[in-house]
């Protein structure tokens, strides 16, 4: 499988720790997508991104220096 996921039951927190500093895509439950460099993620899936961009309906809406995303809004995180 892609992005470090496998059928052998890999720990998601280990995967997230490995991609700190890497470019990621974060999709929210609302369908909004953020792309940026993963700065941190906590046990509640709260996410901090650097050099982030917000995409709505596939179109760039806004660019941010830093973005903080509340974990209960996150549908998935994908390493780019």
Swiss-Prot record:
Subcellular compartments: Cytoplasm; Nucleus
Subunit comment: Component of the heptameric LSM1-LSM7 complex, which consists of lsm1, lsm2, lsm3, lsm4, lsm5, lsm6 and lsm7. Component of the heptameric LSM2-LSM8 complex, which consists of lsm2, lsm3, lsm4, lsm5, lsm6, lsm7 and lsm8. The LSm subunits form a seven-membered ring structure with a doughnut shape.
Biological source species: Neosartorya fischeri (strain ATCC 1020 / DSM 3700 / CBS 544.65 / FGSC A1164 / JCM 1740 / NRRL 181 / WB 181)
The protein's name in its UniProt record: U6 snRNA-associated Sm-like protein LSm6
Family statement drawn from the similarity comment of this UniProt entry: Belongs to the snRNP Sm proteins family. SmF/LSm6 subfamily.
GO molecular function: RNA binding
PANTHER family per the UniProt record, alphabetical: SMALL NUCLEAR RIBONUCLEOPROTEIN F SNRNP-F (PTHR11021), U6 SNRNA-ASSOCIATED SM-LIKE PROTEIN LSM6 (PTHR11021:SF1)
Keywords, sorted A to Z: Cytoplasm, mRNA processing, mRNA splicing, Nucleus, Ribonucleoprotein, RNA-binding, rRNA processing, Spliceosome, tRNA processing
């Amino acid at each position: 499988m892609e992005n470090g996921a496998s059928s052998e039951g890999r720990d998601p927190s280990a995967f997230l720790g490995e991609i700190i500093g890497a470019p990621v895509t974060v999709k929210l439950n609302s369908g909004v997508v953020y792309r940026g460099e993963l700065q941190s993620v906590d046990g509640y899936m709260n996410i901090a991104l650097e050099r982030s961009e917000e995409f709505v309906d596939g179109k760039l809406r806004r660019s941010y220096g830093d973005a903080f995303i509340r974990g209960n809004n996150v549908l998935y995180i994908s390493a780019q």
